[in-house]
Amino acid sequence: MSQRETWATRAGFILAAVGSAVGLGNIWQFPFKTSAYGGATFLVVYLAAALGIGLPAMLAEFVIGRQSNLNAIGAFERLGHRNWKWVGVLGVGTGFWILSYYSVVGGWVLRYIGGSLTGAYFAGPASYFGSVSAGLDALVLHAVFMLLVVAIVAGGVEDGIERATKLMVPSIVVILGALAVWVFTLSGASPGYVYFLSPDLSQLSLSVSFDPFPSFSGPLTNVIPFAVSQAFFSLSLGMGAMITYASYVGEDQSLFGDSITVVVLNSAVGVLAGLVVIPLLFVQGVEPGSGGAGALFISLATAFAELPAGRLVGAVFFAVVLIAALSSAISLLEVVTSYVVDTYGARRPRVAAVLGGLIFLLGTPSAWDTAWLTWFDTLAYQLLLPLSVLGVLLFVGWVYGRPAVEELLSGSSLGQGVGATWLWLARTVVILAVLLTLWLGVQTLFLDGAVVPPV
Ligand code: PHE
């Protein structure tokens, strides 16, 4: 095998990891899932999950990736545990699944850049969303988005990905921050802040009964699977992405420090997007929960239609969202591409193109009808993501064990105690929390009948 590429700089890796993490998950999914599933309650569970489960799980993925120096599937084999390859396969499969509809939403974003410039949505933001979010329009833009992703991945790690992500995070923070300030000045926004930021403690409850299987009830049953999986989704966990990215990292770098940076920045961007979108929904009189997948697009389009220089602001905003979406989508495609390139020694550009084509095909139903998109998304949240993260934690916690601590500590000045605590937590509390998430997800999936595809 030829010499593996590595990141040019330490900042390169952090930026790419942040670039992978910050994406439509934060800007599109987070506000709409928050407004659909309980507002501040969702926020509390999400933040707790990001720190309490996401951080340890991210460290687990970093360790697997750096130690093995290989792609997300090959890694398990190289670490001497062939039987655990299924975890990698599940992760890569989950990434494949998610990218198929992620790309459809990326296509919407492309459309909204144009729609802002021409003012096409100014007259009727809601009906505009309805007409461009499904059907032939959406399909064509889904194809264009996927082509862009393929082009960047084909270029290789340093040239393509590293360069594309450097400017993105600062621009996102600046634009979202400015919008948040503007929203704050609007009348009618305040109930939005209450809904988003002040949790009703009575909603944070969950009860369990055993007859004979555990069955849960209470307000949190619905919130947990979505909020915890939202943390996984937005941190790019359970899809082999962080394994793959960490495989390009040197032994002299502190994985611990890097992962904290990623978690904090990522959650901050999500909350910032929430501070823009949720109060806006209230200003516009949209009932929380009824915004759906169009919440971001409709609420912001309505806002841009009212703003002075709205066309320009809108176009710039959606352009930045596009960059965020691209840098995330790149890392999803990179996972599969790197597996095929490592394993079969095939040429990177060709592999990226073929895989991109397959993912495009898988996404066609979602582009055609948003009911399919919702179905793909629900299955990812309630089943695939928690299952896949569970696999990673079981592997690192119970199978790989001690060597993982050594790998974690390499390149950092942390003491053994921190490493041992991490491993112990990953083995116990964190795994239990993921099990609960999975159980609740599957429970609601079957109770609602949401497993049945919308044919
Ligand atoms: N974390 C990305 C987002 O929030 C999505 C993603 C998941 C990207 C997994 C890569 C890998 O949009």
Enumerate the predicted regions with their spans.
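Membrane-interface "cap" regions at the ends of multi-pass membrane proteins
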Residues: 1-28, 57-62, 66-79, 84-86, ...
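Membrane-embedded translocation segments of transport machinery
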Residues: 2-4, 171-326
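Helix-loop-helix connectors at the membrane interface of multi-pass transporters/channels
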Residues: 4, 108-133, 246-253, 257, ...
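Transmembrane helix-loop boundary segments of multi-pass membrane transporters
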Residues: 29-47, 160-166, 291-295, 313-321, ...
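Inter-helical loop and helix-membrane interface segments of multi-pass membrane transporters/permeases
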Residues: 33-37, 73-90, 103-154, 158, ...
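C-terminal membrane-solvent junction of multi-pass transporters and transport-like membrane proteins
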Residues: 80-83, 87-90, 344-356, 379-437
